[in-house]
Swiss-Prot record:
<dbReference type="GO" id="GO:0008652">
    <property type="term" value="P:amino acid biosynthetic process"/>
</dbReference>
<protein>
    <recommendedName>
        <fullName>Shikimate dehydrogenase (NADP(+))</fullName>
        <ecNumber>1.1.1.25</ecNumber>
    </recommendedName>
</protein>
<dbReference type="GO" id="GO:0050661">
    <property type="term" value="F:NADP binding"/>
</dbReference>
<dbReference type="GO" id="GO:0004764">
    <property type="term" value="F:shikimate 3-dehydrogenase (NADP+) activity"/>
</dbReference>
<dbReference type="InterPro" id="IPR041121">
    <property type="entry name" value="SDH_C"/>
</dbReference>
<dbReference type="InterPro" id="IPR011342">
    <property type="entry name" value="Shikimate_DH"/>
</dbReference>
<comment type="subunit">
    <text>Homodimer.</text>
</comment>
<dbReference type="InterPro" id="IPR006151">
    <property type="entry name" value="Shikm_DH/Glu-tRNA_Rdtase"/>
</dbReference>
<dbReference type="Pfam" id="PF18317">
    <property type="entry name" value="SDH_C"/>
</dbReference>
<feature type="binding site">
    <location>
        <position position="79"/>
    </location>
    <ligand>
        <name>NADP(+)</name>
    </ligand>
</feature>
<keyword id="KW-0057">Aromatic amino acid biosynthesis</keyword>
<feature type="binding site">
    <location>
        <position position="103"/>
    </location>
    <ligand>
        <name>shikimate</name>
    </ligand>
</feature>
<dbReference type="GO" id="GO:0005829">
    <property type="term" value="C:cytosol"/>
</dbReference>
<comment type="similarity">
    <text>Belongs to the shikimate dehydrogenase family.</text>
</comment>
<dbReference type="InterPro" id="IPR013708">
    <property type="entry name" value="Shikimate_DH-bd_N"/>
</dbReference>
<keyword id="KW-0028">Amino-acid biosynthesis</keyword>
<comment type="pathway">
    <text>Metabolic intermediate biosynthesis; chorismate biosynthesis; chorismate from D-erythrose 4-phosphate and phosphoenolpyruvate: step 4/7.</text>
</comment>
Length: 283
């Protein structure tokens, strides 16, 4: 029986844990697959994806900085991908790529089921407005948060995200210079790559953003999450959570789309958490 081919596309992508995660999912479910990492700069992504399809690729994950490009290349889109304006999962069907976004479902599943958080009624600060932020914002709204404030270094992108979400009563954008005026939040989500340079000062955020219930969540993991989580602990956030659980859960969502079966994420998460020192950055 031929082995089906899958891949994760990104730039850079050598650090990605997705090949290890999907290989373990395959072993667990008895599904034979070949899953590799393919480095593709933005300008080469379309051609690289076409080569992958020509060579028999059945599905792909997409990480930074290609999620919005994947959205544009998909022939059809799921509702959640359309709302996000970004794609992290591609399914090959009848010679066409179908785009989906499992990031938000992965984040909410990790926060509610693994971390035990009730997201209902929380006021949320979302840092960033790129593909990662777009992927999680709709799912957070669906989970029952009260309000979301989007802050991004480029205000135009924050405005565009808010417009796309279409819930002006719950979602607003503010300038990064306004952080001290925003009050406190029960959930602060870092959807930026500002920690990639390991700059401890990258997250000199006002302490007034934090209250006694605040959960601070970085969508990154490993070294890239260190600066934000260090701020969260110094600010005495009740929870400081990295993106490893989200990574595993969104991968399980993608796996289910491709294979029709959802794997058990707990053993894979536990194994990766035990290797935490070697983790680098987020998918």
């Amino acid at each position: 029986m031929p082995v089906s081919r899958y891949a994760v596309f990104g730039h850079p992508v050598a650090h990605s844990l997705s090949p290890a995660i999907h290989t373990e999912f395959g072993k667990q479910t008895g599904i034979a697959l070949d899953y590799t990492a393919i480095d593709a700069p933005l300008e080469d992504f379309s051609a690289a994806l076409q080569r992958f399809a020509d060579e028999g690729g059945k599905g792909a994950n997409v990480t930074l900085p290609l999620k919005e490009a994947a959205y544009a290349l998909a022939s059809s889109l799921s509702d959640r991908a359309r709302l996000a304006g970004a794609v992290n999962t591609l399914v090959r069907n009848d010679g066409q790529w179908q785009g989906d976004n499992t990031d938000g479902a992965g984040l909410v599943r990790d926060l509610t089921e693994r971390q035990g958080l009730d997201l209902r009624g929380r006021r949320v600060l979302l840092l960033g407005a790129g593909g990662a932020a777009r992927g999680v914002a709709p799912a957070l709204l669906e989970a029952g948060i009260t309000a979301m404030v989007v802050v991004n270094r480029s205000p135009e992108r924050a405005d565009a995200l808010c417009d796309a979400l279409g819930e002006p009563a719950r979602v607003t954008s503010r300038y990064i210079e306004d952080l001290r005026e925003l009050g406190d939040f029960e959930l602060i989500v870092n959807a930026t790559a500002a920690g990639r340079d390991r700059d401890a000062g990258a997250f000199a955020l006002p302490l007034g953003l934090v209250n006694s219930l605040t959960a601070a969540v970085d969508l990154n993991y490993g070294d890239t999450a260190i600066a934000f989580l260090a701020w969260a602990r110094a600010a005495q956030c009740r929870y400081a959570i990295d993106g490893l659980g989200m990574l595993v859960e969104q991968a399980a969502e993608s796996f289910a789309l491709w294979h029709g079966v959802r794997p058990d994420t707990d053993p894979v998460y536990a194994a990766l958490r035990a290797r935490e020192a070697v983790l680098v950055s987020a998918d």
